[in-house]
């Protein structure tokens, strides 16, 4: 009995000594896995490689004997995946409605369909990135995914700009715009938009990345600082153009309201309320776009790869919300989209509102 007790005490002493040696080794400089990503792994748009450092697409996740990943899932990655799922579901519905309803194939709804398609691809990209990051970690797949996401979000922002231009022209040249605008012209505009977006997405895949030179990495790996600066500058230009056009739209709306007031010798309350509502809607549209993307675009310029990864997550996640809100602003508020929804979910519904092509300012 005494011998077994002594052996037990001796084993406990050895265990304590081993734990002390491990703690000393850690204090002396053993690598730390960090709290914002899986052990020995970091992923762009996914778990950062520690509390400090940019998000990285390359992931080397530890696997167990059976090949299953044993690393903990980053909660930020889960939020991005959930956001992508909601985005994909909403925009898939919009794309299906426009594609299946002949009355919604006008130039205006083609622009809305382009926006919904871009956001749908962005949502699918967020989901696939989560899957590949934790199931099939690979630098090649990571480059493809970041290129896919860059192209999708670039197409989304470009489609928003195209819709803004369409709104402005429809109000500024109201008498001649609809007779000149054709589906072919809209398709050519969107073809140019998607070509530029695809080109931006292909740049990392074609070699403009920081996999070979980690010192050139931005806050989102494997994108280089120069590439991120180009994307941010492009966004600022697009945002500036949209801001200018929306200010001009407000001026046109108020001028029309003033002309009505002169004709009627007073501004009738219904016209005043409609004008204020229209201006308020434009403010919400532009404010939502700016609040979603500006923080991430600014941080991409001023941030560095040594900054905590949580900063990138905290600015990137709201940017994805813009693709979640776009269907509500540009599609589900439209009466024809609402009627198509009723017909989809309740075929017996008979709406008294006839199909007609609403002006882009009403979308």
Curated annotation (Swiss-Prot):
Q: Where is the lipid attached (S-palmitoyl cysteine)?
A: 346
Does the keyword Glycoprotein belong to this entry?
Answer: yes
Chain ranges passing through the membrane: 76-95, 108-131, 144-165, 187-206, 232-250, 279-305, 311-332
In the record, Phosphoserine modifications are located at 357, 359, 361
What ranges does the Cytoplasmic topological domain annotation cover? 96-107, 166-186, 251-278, 333-363
Q: Which PROSITE patterns does the UniProt entry name for this protein?
A: G_PROTEIN_RECEP_F1_1 (PS00237), G_PROTEIN_RECEP_F1_2 (PS50262)
Transmembrane as UniProt keyword: yes
Please give one Gene Ontology molecular function term for this protein.
Answer: sphingosine-1-phosphate receptor activity
Q: How does this protein lie in the membrane? A: Multi-pass membrane protein
Q: Which UniProt keywords apply?
A: Cell membrane, G-protein coupled receptor, Glycoprotein, Lipoprotein, Membrane, Palmitate, Phosphoprotein, Receptor, Transducer, Transmembrane, Transmembrane helix
Give the main location.
Answer: membrane
Q: Subcellular localization, per the record?
A: Cell membrane
Disrupted gene: phenotype observed: Deficient mice show reduced striatal cyclic AMP production and selective alterations in instrumental conditioning.
Q: Where is this region: Disordered?
A: 29-48
Give the positions annotated as glycosylation sites. 2, 9, 52
Family the UniProt entry places it in? Belongs to the G-protein coupled receptor 1 family.
Name-wise, this protein is G-protein coupled receptor 6
